[in-house]
A protein has these predicted regions:
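Terminal-region recognition feature
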Residues: 1-193, 199
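Acidic, divalent-metal-coordinating active-site segment for phosphoryl/phosphodiester hydrolysis
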Residues: 201-205
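C-terminal binding/interaction regions
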Residues: 208
Length: 208
């Protein structure tokens, strides 16, 4: 082996080792094993050692569910108000919007999944635990109504801590509203599939 080839191989091994040492690692909270962050992300945030599933953001779930560039969002500009002037509610909404880049805890829209047109509903627990307030209830109701009108199936990824207490009775009203929209969709003979993600609790479980 030529001397320059020897140095080239040594340099390559050094660079590979350096890259591995500096790559961000994910430590699984279940098995405590560390895996490269890139590998963890490529596998949909699933631990390759113990099959632990980390919580996904709405954007991450959309990326692995809908066909590429097929998603058209509904009601993108809708956002929560503070009708009861609940202490610190406006600040919590603003903080969640900054942290997640979302207007509220759910995104709805139309896409194709393996080529099939579908209305998609995705809740994001990173936004105030995806609690169901007026905006969440209204967007879900409108999504079902649009799907019923167009004769499309609905796929919903639920992940919610329940009703949003800062909106009081207005939050509880969303249970009846969404349930009614689901019932009308079912009466039309259309498909509705719920994927219950972590966490799915309380009024969301009872409503849709």
């Amino acid at each position: 082996m030529a001397l320059e080839d020897l140095f080239r191989n040594v340099t390559k091994r050094f660079n590979d080792d350096t890259t591995a040492e500096h790559e961000p690692m994910f430590k699984c909270p279940r098995c405590q094993q560390s895996v490269p962050e890139s590998q963890f992300q490529e596998q949909g945030k699933v631990c390759p050692n113990c099959n632990y599933h980390a919580r996904l953001t709405a954007a991450e779930r959309l990326r692995i569910t809908a066909d590429k560039n097929s998603f058209v969002e509904y009601d993108a500009g809708m956002h929560s108000a503070d009708p009861l002037h609940f202490p610190d509610y406006a600040q919590k909404i603003e903080r969640s919007q900054t942290q997640t880049g979302m207007r509220d805890a759910v995104i709805t829209g139309e896409c194709t999944i393996k080529g099939s047109r579908t209305v998609l509903i995705i809740m994001d627990s990173h936004f105030m635990m995806a609690s169901m307030g007026s905006v969440v209830g209204e967007k879900i109701t409108r999504a079902f109504e649009t799907a019923t009108e167009k004769g499309l199936p609905v796929v919903a990824f639920t992940a919610s801590g329940g009703a949003r207490m800062q909106e009081g009775i207005l939050s509880l009203m969303q249970m009846a509203k969404t349930s009614g929209a689901v019932a009308r969709h079912s009466e039309a003979g259309l498909l509705y599939l719920t994927v219950m993600a972590d966490p799915t609790t309380g009024g969301v479980t009872a409503s849709f």
